């Protein structure tokens, strides 16, 4: 039997041993503060959708995400709207608006209207990819980047002239945009303005006598009195003139002509038609704004009257510094550099033993939708072939398709050959 004194001695020895062990562990395992940890960024894996290499996220809206991408055939920089069918079904008129936008954009070609380059569809994942020409920034993003929320007069004038050019083209094609606002005006690196988002636009019937419309889904702050007051019918073109007037008011003053705590109060104020123009706008701009924001649509300026106005025709001096394109909100990159470069590096480092990248290997094809009054591509080429020699067209870096559907095979042979050629092409691009 052990005596208490011997048990105490053994206990003290055990405690001493554990203490020595803990000191040893501290010496063996180097303890560092969490702030000293350097986290290795996750390697970006390349993903190809058809012939397009995906880049980083550019933005996200109610309809889906917008990402940058690179055309592996032409090496043109593109933007893509990624639309999920499940999400579109939850949005009122979501699928119908997207289909309408595709139908309209397919027949439009103008410097100041966004161009649709391609439409891809993944049947298994129920995804649609709308490939558009790339724009570096949105006008609303530029306005939000400065404290007073407006452009210098000369800069606003340049953008407004381009807006009128694009709007005149849309109207000449019988299209009412219905949602002109800074948030739907995009800009390229050289300052070219592009009218975008034709989801709520309306194509007038080719044989319609006027521009009468009956529905509107535009942004409330940019709607005219006839819509705010709930009229059954209204002039579609004059709605766009009013919205362009509110846009001009906003980009020159940083304010809105009509405001309200809620949509009901806002529409009440718009319906009355009472607004004021800041004195710093000057007499010429004030007169143009009053003409575009005329309560009576019949007296409201037409595009021809806007073009003939002295403020529109005047050459405005560069007195204030220009509002530049702001840095990217995600990466803070002031140059808005190509975001597909890390993915190109991933392709460049590919070896035969490695799994190359994620590849949308399901059925992906270009979709065509018939537009009222539009000649189908097959019929068009059949007609032109009999009267003139065939000629391959190239629209903004994309070749015209003779078929309405282009399927991508899921066989391993196609993947090996096509993907291999893309790797060689993109790797050569990176080395240059």
Curated annotation (Swiss-Prot):
It holds the Pfam family Pkinase. It catalyses: L-seryl-[protein] + ATP = O-phospho-L-seryl-[protein] + ADP + H(+); L-threonyl-[protein] + ATP = O-phospho-L-threonyl-[protein] + ADP + H(+). One of its GO terms (molecular function) is protein serine/threonine kinase activity. ATP binds at residues 58-66, 81. It is found in: Nucleus; Cytoplasm. Its EC number is 2.7.11.1. Oocytes, eggs and early embryos. GO terms for biological process: DNA damage response; establishment of cell polarity; glucose homeostasis; intracellular signal transduction; intrinsic apoptotic signaling pathway by p53 class mediator; negative regulation of cell growth; protein autophosphorylation; regulation of cell growth. Keywords: Apoptosis, ATP-binding, Cell cycle, Cytoplasm, DNA damage, Kinase, Magnesium, Manganese, Metal-binding, Nucleotide-binding, Nucleus, Phosphoprotein, Serine/threonine-protein kinase, Transferase, Tumor suppressor. It is an enzyme of class 2 (transferase). Residues 422-432 have a biased composition (Basic residues). The active site is at 179 (proton acceptor). The modification Phosphoserine is found at residue 427. Gene3D superfamilies: Phosphorylase Kinase, domain 1 (3.30.200.20), Transferase(Phosphotransferase) domain 1 (1.10.510.10). Residues 409-421 have a biased composition (Polar residues). Catalytic component of a trimeric complex composed of STK11/LKB1, STRAD (STRADA or STRADB) and CAB39/MO25 (CAB39/MO25alpha or CAB39L/MO25beta). Belongs to the protein kinase superfamily. CAMK Ser/Thr protein kinase family. LKB1 subfamily. This is Serine/threonine-protein kinase stk11. It comes from Xenopus laevis (African clawed frog). The lineage of its organism: Eukaryota, Metazoa, Chordata, Craniata, Vertebrata.
